[in-house]
C-alpha cells in the first residue's frame, strides 16, 4: 500500500557447502546488485519501496551475525555496486545508497538462537554497521540436554519434510554441528562433552515442550523487545510453519486457535 514498505525474505546466498571460491561470492553479490537496481527502478516509477532480506540459517553460506556482516562489508559491496552502476548508469555513491536501501537482513530469532547468539546484541551489531533489518521473524527453536532422556524425547521430532539442523554447545564452549536431526541422534552419544542441543525445529512460541525439552523462546528477553520497540524493524512476522509435522505431544491443537495464541504472546511482549 501507499506509504508502506514491502519486505521479502530469501535464502542467505546458498547452502554453505556449495560455495567454493571468492568468485562464487561475487556472483551472488552481482545477482543481489541486480535485484537492488530493479527495486530502485520500481521505487522511482511507482513510489513503492521494496527490500530483500537475506536470512542467515545454520549450514548456509551465511550462518552467524559475524559472517553476515563480513559479507555485507566485503564481497557484497565489491560485486553488487559495480552491477548497480552498470544497470542504472549511476555514481558509486548512488549505487551504494541503493544497495543499502534495498538489500538487508531477515532476522530469524530461531536461527540466531541456534548459533548461541544473543538476539538483542545481534540486532545492535547490524544497526551499528548500518545494515538494514528488512524483517524480523519471531520464532523459537527446540532445545534439549544432550542426555539419554533428551535424545529419546527428540526422536519423536524426526520427520522427512523439513531439514532440522542441530547445534550442540560443548563444555569447552565450542559449537558442534549436524546437518539434520537423524545424524545428530546417531552421533551425539559418541561425542563427549556436549552440554546442550538446539534444533532447527520451529515450535510454537507459547508452548513449553514436555521436560526434558524446552524452547529458545526465553532468549527473546526484555532487551530484545526493547530493540523492537525502539524501531529496529517495522516488519515483524510470526514464523511457526511446522504445525503439520509437530508430534502430538507438543502440538497445541487447533491451528486457528494456535495462531491466535501466538499473536497474543507476541503482542503481549510488544
For each predicted feature, which ranges?
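Alpha-helical scaffolding segments of alpha/beta enzyme cores, especially the outer helices
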Residues: 27-41, 66-74, 121-128, 222, ...
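Active-site acidic/histidine proton-transfer and metal-coordination neighborhood
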Residues: 1-104, 114
